[in-house]
């Protein structure tokens, strides 16, 4: 014989919940007395307090082994990469000469990018250094902070400086300037060279034919040793990365040209197939004319 369980009314259910939350007969709150709740809270307070103290101690010990200025571990790849400006999606520099909007965004990006290179700002923040030698600033047992940086003036970029330039870095005339910069690598030395230099060329034979002539600023694409070594963002507060500007004079219009630029120095390898940006950068250039 099946015994049916008596169905409780809504009022009975409410009364049971009220008694569970607070039982006036046993003075229990949610099934526990005040003493029981006090012991539970004390346990979790001690438990989580111990975990917090242990985490804080391990973090403090770890931070004692880490320098505020130089990373303890660095990338296995010691060769700096190259990148271009203006920064574009997929490294495609496309210019429609007759369409101002197509190149005005490039001009605005370059204006902002080159602003810290203004001669007045460089003279205020950085030093005039002796060219052809590394600008080393050892600590010698005492923290030498902040490190000084050498001036790289905007006027060194010649016809690509954008100073008094009505052609907007050449974009309005179909002779655009593309800027090459090296990524920063702490304590990087290029070798015994007097300088490094950037070279550019078409990736394939047909690209070389369509690329035409170009000029580089500073002359020959030189990057002087005085801008090295780099000591890190916190040490080198006002460090200014050296640039090389490439002005393309007569690119074949309406044709996509693949360009590759490389940095040449004794300690820079540009043939590492694992990293396509190690010491080099490839980009596409297209000048559309109607």
UniProtKB/Swiss-Prot annotation:
Annotated glycosylation sites: 96, 118, 153, 159, 193, 197, 238
Protein keywords: Cell adhesion, Cell membrane, Disulfide bond, Glycoprotein, Ion transport, Membrane, Potassium, Potassium transport, Signal-anchor, Sodium, Sodium transport, Sodium/potassium transport, Transmembrane, Transmembrane helix, Transport
InterPro entries (alphabetical): Na/K_ATPase_sub_beta, Na/K_ATPase_sub_beta_sf
Transmembrane portions of the chain: 40-67
Keyword Signal found: no
UniProt domain comment: The C-terminal lobe folds into an immunoglobulin-like domain and mediates cell adhesion properties.
Entry similarity comment: Belongs to the X(+)/potassium ATPases subunit beta family.
Full protein name: Sodium/potassium-transporting ATPase subunit beta-2
Classification lineage: Eukaryota, Metazoa, Chordata, Craniata, Vertebrata
């Amino acid at each position: 014989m099946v015994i049916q369980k008596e169905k409780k009314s809504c009022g009975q259910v409410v009364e049971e919940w009220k008694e569970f939350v607070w039982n006036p007969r046993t003075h229990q709150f949610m099934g526990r007395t005040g003493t029981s709740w006090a012991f539970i809270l004390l346990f979790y307070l001690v438990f989580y307090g111990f975990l917090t103290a242990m985490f804080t101690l391990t973090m403090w010990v770890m931070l004692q082994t880490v320098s505020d200025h130089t990373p303890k571990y660095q990338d296995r790849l010691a060769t700096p990469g190259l990148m271009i400006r203006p920064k574009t999606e997929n490294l495609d520099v496309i210019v429609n000469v007759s369409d101002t909007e197509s190149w005005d965004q490039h001009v605005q990006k370059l204006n902002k990018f080159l602003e810290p290179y203004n001669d007045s700002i460089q003279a205020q923040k950085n030093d005039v250094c002796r060219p052809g030698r590394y600008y080393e600033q050892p600590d010698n047992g005492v923290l030498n902070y902040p490190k000084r940086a050498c001036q790289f003036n905007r006027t060194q970029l010649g016809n690509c400086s954008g100073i008094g330039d009505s052609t907007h870095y050449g974009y309005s005339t179909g002779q655009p300037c593309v800027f090459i910069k090296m990524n920063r690598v702490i304590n990087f030395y290029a070798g015994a060279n007097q300088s490094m230099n950037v070279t550019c060329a078409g990736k394939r034979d047909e690209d070389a034919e369509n690329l035409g002539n170009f000029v580089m600023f500073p002359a020959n694409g030189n990057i002087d040793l005085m801008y090295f070594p780099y000591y890190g963002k916190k040490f080198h507060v006002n460090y200014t990365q050296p640039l090389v500007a490439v002005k393309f004079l007569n690119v074949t219009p309406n044709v996509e040209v693949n360009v590759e630029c490389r940095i040449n120095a004794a300690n820079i390898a540009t043939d590492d197939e694992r990293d396509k940006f190690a010491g080099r950068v490839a980009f596409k250039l297209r000048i559309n004319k109607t």
